[in-house]
UniProtKB/Swiss-Prot annotation:
Keywords: Ribonucleoprotein, Ribosomal protein, RNA-binding, rRNA-binding. One of two assembly initiator proteins, it binds directly to the 5'-end of the 23S rRNA, where it nucleates assembly of the 50S subunit. One of the proteins that surrounds the polypeptide exit tunnel on the outside of the subunit. This is Large ribosomal subunit protein uL24. NCBIfam families: rplX_bact (TIGR01079). Disulfide bonds: none annotated. GO terms for cellular component: ribonucleoprotein complex; ribosome.
Length: 105
C-alpha cells in the first residue's frame, strides 16, 4: 500500500495526461491502488443498462480515478502547484505547509 500525498477535499492540479493544467477537488483517495478521484477530471462514458434505480439507462458521463503521481497540490495563496512540508505548531499539532510561500494547507 503506497502512501498518497493528497487528502480528500484538497485542491490539486493535473501535471500530466489529457487533462494537464486543470484543477479540481479530490473527491476520494484510494491508497491501496495509489489512485485519486478528482472532480471534473478524467471524464469517461459508461454504458448503463436500465435497472430499477435508472429506468432509462443510456450513456452516463462520470469521473474515473487517476494515479496520484499525476497530481500535485495546488496552493491558493501563491496560485501554483507546490510540494508540502510538515511543521509542528506550539500546541503540538502537525500541519502541512506550502514549500513556496509557507502557507498552512
Amino acid at each position: 500500500m503506497a502512501k498518497v500525498h493528497v487528502r480528500k477535499k484538497d485542491t490539486v492540479m493535473i501535471i500530466s495526461g489529457k487533462d494537464k493544467g486543470k484543477t479540481g477537488e479530490v473527491l476520494a483517495v484510494m491508497p491501496k491502488v495509489s489512485k485519486v478521484l478528482v472532480s471534473g477530471i478524467n471524464i469517461v462514458s459508461k454504458h448503463q443498462k436500465p435497472n430499477k434505480q435508472n429506468m432509462e439507462g443510456g450513456i452516463i458521463r462520470k469521473e474515473a480515478a487517476i494515479y496520484s503521481s499525476k497530481v500535485m497540490l495546488y496552493c491558493e495563496k501563491c496560485k501554483s502547484v507546490t510540494r508540502i512540508s510538515h511543521k509542528i505548531l506550539e500546541d503540538g499539532t502537525k500541519v502541512r505547509v506550502c514549500k513556496k510561500c509557507g502557507e498552512t494547507l
